[in-house]
Regions:
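Collagenous Gly-X-Y triple-helix signature in extracellular proteins
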Residues: 6-200
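Short amphipathic alpha-helical heptad-repeat segments
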Residues: 1-5
């Protein structure tokens, strides 16, 4: 009886592996809006580039996270430290380190100031310009909370020392102080020749 049970378990495992393999597709074949599943949640394709794919988590990856105690400069923020350590490590376990592309992001403020320059990283929140570009894809009224961008609203010199742009579930954008707590919906760029499990 015990042997039969073990054989049944082994058969179930083999069938599951076959199903998983059948659902595997090359990331480059997915279109914007398409979803794929991983051990850490579902991702949405935002854009296909030559050999690379821009993706974002379908849901909030973390909740109740502070941007920073006093800075709206993403490069100096607590949120960047979280993305560069804990979140990146979780992504690397799923996609492998070499498949996550390091890239530069423009930290121009919402009102067009260049005070914060650019940031180079692998995993981060979207910028305001990216939120605007992908707004039709990002909207999800089922999200439980707003989420951070890495874009400051303005600067101290213009009277906005602590404000950062945040995105609502329906895609609307507002500002709040950096010390508030919101969700994190990480963005990254992956090599598009990897294989993923296509979602429904």
């Amino acid at each position: 009886m015990k042997q039969m049970l073990e054989k049944a378990k082994e058969l179930v495992k083999m069938l599951q592996a076959a199903v998983d393999e059948e659902q595997q597709v090359q990331l480059s074949t997915l279109k914007p809006r398409d979803k794929f599943t991983t051990d850490i949640g579902e991702f949405i394709v935002l854009e296909q580039l030559e050999g690379q794919t821009k993706v974002i988590t379908a849901k909030l990856f973390k909740e109740n996270v502070r941007f920073d105690d006093s800075s709206t400069d993403y490069k100096k923020s607590e949120l960047k430290k979280l993305c560069d350590t804990e979140i990146l490590q979780e992504f690397e376990k799923v996609f492998e380190t070499d498949n996550i592309v390091e890239h530069a992001a423009d930290l121009t403020t919402l009102d067009g100031q260049k005070a914060f320059g650019t940031v180079v990283c692998k995993v981060r929140p979207l910028t305001f310009d990216e939120v605007r570009k992908y707004t039709e894809i990002l909207s999800d009224k089922e999200l439980p909370d707003w989420y951070w961008t890495c874009t400051a609203w303005s600067t101290k010199e213009r009277g906005w020392e602590y404000s950062v742009a945040v995105v609502g579930p329906s895609g609307n954008v507002s500002d709040d102080v950096c010390g508030s707590q919101y969700g994190v919906r990480p963005f990254c760029i992956l090599k598009s020749n990897i294989f993923v499990s296509k979602g429904e």
